[in-house]
Amino acid sequence: SEAKKKKRDVSLDGVTNVDVPVPETDEEKEALVAKFLDGLRKLLSKENNWTFLQPLMLSLDNCVKCNTCSNACPIYNESGRIEAYRPLFRSDVLRRIVNKYLKPGGKLTAKFTGADIDLNWETVARLAQMSYRCTLCRRCAQTCPMGVDNGLLSREIRKLFSQEMGIAPQELHTDG
């Protein structure tokens, strides 16, 4: 409904699949971004994510942006090839955030390394939306010549939002 759309972020494509409330104050916006960055740090730490850290880092570091994954992705193809549904799109957003905000010197070198992205509540909300625009079928990983697993990246992003931020589709999170 229109009333629900005003209270929830639908900026990606006019549809919401994840219940991300629109922050009302600047403090709420900053808190959402800070919580996301804290969760991302945990996701990239050996202590908190030792089982998936190596494949996660390989997938973040080894993408050459050839877009081979796009042709294999059923969501991207069925969407009519909408850019936001491309497997590379969501992983590249995450990659740019990690490179700019979590790597040493990232903010200084962001413009030169392709990591120039503004991290605000809208970027966080769109990343949450994008993570559920993936079936986790991992066809992207099967076709990638570099072995990048965008399905794994989507799953790890979902894990961050669900476990660290309490943001997930209602059908999954509360309705089981």
Per-segment meaning from a language model:
Residues 1-65, 70-71, 75, 99-101, ...:
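Iron-sulfur (Fe-S) cluster-binding modules
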Residues 32-36, 50-60, 85, 95-176:
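Iron-sulfur-cluster electron-transfer modules
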Residues 64, 89, 152:
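Conserved active-site and cofactor/substrate-binding residues in soluble primary-metabolism enzymes
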Residues 66-72, 76-79, 137-143, 147:
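Cys/His-rich metal-chelating microdomains
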Residues 79-93:
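N-terminal cofactor/phosphate-binding cores enriched in small/glycine residues
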